[in-house]
């Protein structure tokens, strides 16, 4: 990448052409600044370097030494001859070793990057002094970072947040996928260790338990993609149509209608989805209404409902549950999309609409030739985001089907999956109910790959089309 190349080239030039103070600052950050008359900077960078080295010496090194095995000493009770009591031995905690090792790797990378920046900074000071110019003092440097380089100040905390709450957990997730961390290997009572690609073979290979996970992954991935597609585009087009109807000049009280549809967004999903689950249960009010209206008998007659059922299994049979979930998601998602579409439709250039009307275009032609392309060009990135969000849409699936849907598919059941599971709900169930962290980590990687590939491909095509309405 150009940015990385420029950074390393700048460091290489600084280290090659720098004086002794510049070169030595790579190892002892403060010495370079002392040599170039920057005492406050020297104190601050020495403090930062000292904290980093302290962490590595007392927390990083002991755990990195055990990183290859993730521990060898199990927790057990031993007899202490001093106290004449049974006490817990000095055992290894595999997860603590893994966690601290990953943090240590990040700290090491950060220290190296910081050392390179210190060398580059010292080289700049060296050149300023060689030119006979005066270098900034500490207060002047602070003013620079509050003015010309204020963007650096603003980005510091967000970058730290990304490292701590995104990069480190991601590294741990990837690492766990290569271990046997599950219910039989739970720290601190037991140890887990590295198993290489075994978990990936379990997911994609064949034979025994492997075949059930491979079968389940294919089924769950297929439903996840089908769900994400319909959940995204039904709400997208539904929101557009609803926005057009409400904003039409013939519609009475548009503000009232817009407010009524907003209720589904205003009420938390945790409340609405649990209520809806009760409405659509086998003995719920909706089934009672369908039976009284003769719909249940009609479905029996046309073969869409098994003769032995006296109710419509909205949330208890795979096909019905998938259809019902998508319909409920339309009810939840269309009002939100309506608001976005309303804003976009109001910003379509009036001259485009007027030109089309003069050319004799009817409303349908104007929608497909002007409004829809404009909406797609503006909301393209939002559609990609919505698709990824729906791939990870935990609430709708889990709250509607948990404790209601029971699978009869034994292969799915053996791998703790259900027909209506998304990858993310399957992952959640593996961790929270069955403590199968190793396979959950593999699924987490698969979710990331699916979302990343889709996002990259979509943005590639979006960038090609973005100039159409510019």
Regions found by a protein language model. Give the residues of each.
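A structural signal for multi-pass alpha-helical bundles of membrane permease subunits
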Residues: 59-67, 150-470
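N-terminal signal-anchor/first transmembrane alpha helix
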Residues: 1-22, 27-34, 39-42, 46-54, ...
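Pore-loop/selectivity-filter region of tetrameric P-loop cation channels
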Residues: 27-29, 79-87, 202, 206-207
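Short, membrane-exposed interhelical loops at transmembrane-helix boundaries
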Residues: 75-94, 360, 429
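Transmembrane-helix bundle segments that line or gate the permeation/cavity pathway
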Residues: 37, 59-76, 106
């Amino acid at each position: 990448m150009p940015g990385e190349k420029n950074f390393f080239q700048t460091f290489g030039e600084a280290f090659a052409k720098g004086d002794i103070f510049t070169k030595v600052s790579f190892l002892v950050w403060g010495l370079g600044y002392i040599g170039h008359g920057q005492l406050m900077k020297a104190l601050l960078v020495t403090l930062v370097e000292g904290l980093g080295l302290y962490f590595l010496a007392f927390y990083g090194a002991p755990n990195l030494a055990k990183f290859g095995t993730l521990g060898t000493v199990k927790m057990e009770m031993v007899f202490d001859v001093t106290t004449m009591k049974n006490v817990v031995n000095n055992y290894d905690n595999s997860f603590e070793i893994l966690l601290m090792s990953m943090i240590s790797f990040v700290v090491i990378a950060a220290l190296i990057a910081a050392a390179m920046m210190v060398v580059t900074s010292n080289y700049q000071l060296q050149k300023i002094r060689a030119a006979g110019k005066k270098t900034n003092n500490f207060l002047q440097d602070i003013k620079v970072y509050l003015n010309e380089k204020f963007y650096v100040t603003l980005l510091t905390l967000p970058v730290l947040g990304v490292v701590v709450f995104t990069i480190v957990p991601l590294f741990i997730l990837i690492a766990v996928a290569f271990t046997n961390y599950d219910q039989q290997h739970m720290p601190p009572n037991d140890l887990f260790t590295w198993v290489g690609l075994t978990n990936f073979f379990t997911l994609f290979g064949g034979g025994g338990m492997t075949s059930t996970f491979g079968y389940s992954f294919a089924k769950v991935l297929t439903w996840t993609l089908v769900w994400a597609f319909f959940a995204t585009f039904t709400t997208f087009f539904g929101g557009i149509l609803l926005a057009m109807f409400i904003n039409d000049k013939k519609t009475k009280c548009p503000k009232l209608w817009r407010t009524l549809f907003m209720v589904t967004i205003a009420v938390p999903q945790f409340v609405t989805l649990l209520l809806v689950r009760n409405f659509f249960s086998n003995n719920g009010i909706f089934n009672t209404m369908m039976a009284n209206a003769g719909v249940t008998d009609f479905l029996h007659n046309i073969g869409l409902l098994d003769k032995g059922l006296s109710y419509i299994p909205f949330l208890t049979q795979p096909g019905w549950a998938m259809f019902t979930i998508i319909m409920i998601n339309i009810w939840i998602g269309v009002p939100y999309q309506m608001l976005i579409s309303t804003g976009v439709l109001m910003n379509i250039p009036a001259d485009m609409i007027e030109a089309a009307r003069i050319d004799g275009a009817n409303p349908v032609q104007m929608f497909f030739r002007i409004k829809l392309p404009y909406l797609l060009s503006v909301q393209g990135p939002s559609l990609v985001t919505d698709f990824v969000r729906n791939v990870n849409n935990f609430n709708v699936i889990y709250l509607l089907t948990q404790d209601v849907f029971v699978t009869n598919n034994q292969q799915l059941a053996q791998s703790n999956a259900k027909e209506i599971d998304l990858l993310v709900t399957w992952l959640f169930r593996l961790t929270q109910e069955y403590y199968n962290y190793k396979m959950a980590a593999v699924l987490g990687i698969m979710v990331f790959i699916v979302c990343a590939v889709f996002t990259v491909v979509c943005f590639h095509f979006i960038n090609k089309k973005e100039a159409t309405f510019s």
